[in-house]
Amino acid sequence: MPHGDGNWPGFDVVRLSSEQLFPVCSPKLLVGRRRLTRPVDELKFPLIHVDDRKDWARWLEAAGVDGAELSHGPVLNRVSMAIDAALDGQGITLARTTLSATDLINGRLLRPFADELRLAKTYWIICPKATTTLPKIVTFRDWLLAEAANDLRQLKKLGTRRRS
């Protein structure tokens, strides 16, 4: 599935779901006395970056943390690698809804804060317009949309899980 703004001329385009960016970490990162009670507390942990440090700067600014020093923590080139590092307890990363849903639902990751950034780009289901009404295409598209909607329902029930 392509990731982008939904502009693919000549194709039938359906948004899989809206996309937000938010911090996630492994519950094992917060064992013992380690706490995350305010967004600024994240700076006491390794921040796992993807491509550059801009997403963390944007997220922290939106959460009311200005002028944070972001030169610590690894910079990885794939979101999946950053999520794997967070799962391993190596730090806190910023994750997208669709890429972290399963790990959040199953308790392998947690969201320490409800703050999130809405992203303009997301994942899309696309197919040539000539094939959009084929039964196998309709069945597959409807299944994908139902799975995404189910994940979002479970995530809403889950909410933010803090370790105190």
Features from the language model and the residues they span:
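Alpha-helical segments flanking ligand/cofactor-binding loops in enzyme cores
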Residues: 14, 40, 83-84, 138
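Hydrophobic hinge/microswitch elements
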Residues: 67-111, 116-119, 149
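Acidic, Gly/Pro-rich loop/turn segments at junctions of secondary structure
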Residues: 1-75
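Residues that form or immediately flank small-molecule/cofactor binding pockets and catalytic motifs
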Residues: 4-5, 52, 81, 114-117, ...
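C-terminal effector-binding regulatory domain of bacterial HTH transcription factors
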Residues: 97-106, 116-164
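Short, flexible helix/strand-to-coil boundary loops that buttress conserved ligand/catalytic motifs
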Residues: 34, 60-63, 104, 113, ...
